[in-house]
Amino acid sequence: MAPIPVVRAAIRRLRAHPPPPAQRIAIVHGDYRSGNMMHDGAGRMLAMFDWEMAHLGDPLEDLGWALDPIWDHFQPGIACGMLPRDEALAVWRAHSGLDVDPVAMRWWALFNSVKGRAIWTSAYREFIDGGRTDPVLAFSGWYLPRRQDAIIAAQLEGLA
């Protein structure tokens, strides 16, 4: 697979303009989104799944991943298909006790878009190499990269 110009531009941007220091270091899930949560139907989260990317870092990384437009379920501005973005940010602020620095959020949003693009590409590679036959992996290589590339381009345009 060939290098992707929009991803290369994003990586250059991330390297040239690192985020401000984290307000605090915390456990970062790495794939924090509604698809990895179990809840009771009344708004209480019961469990969080899929911890293979967990590490210590800036909690804004998880927030940026959860707010990536790739998870909006075709409802622009709706975080993870659940809440309006502003409401999701207010809930996060209230429960984390942290501010959401707009400069840091833009960095983490772009970082997570690049991370997502890498995930979709590697999942598709597993499918085309014949290692796995799950059709979700084929979808990962067909639709998600195109959408993520458009998201990255829009993010870069907003940073210019």
Identify the role of each PLM range.
Residues L60-G97, F111-G130:
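Active-site activation/catalytic loop segments of kinase-like enzymes and analogous catalytic loops
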Residues F49-A54:
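Activation of the activation-loop gatekeeper triad in protein kinase-fold domains
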Residues E126-A160:
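Regulatory N- and C-terminal appendages and interdomain linkers associated
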Residues G35-H39:
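Hydrophobic residue at the +6 position relative to the catalytic HRD Asp in the kinase catalytic loop
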Residues M1-G30, D40-G41, G97:
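An alpha-helical support segment within catalytic cores of ATP-dependent transferases
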Residues M45:
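Conserved active-site segments centered on acidic
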Residues D99-F111:
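All-alpha amphipathic helical-bundle segments outside canonical DNA-binding/catalytic cores
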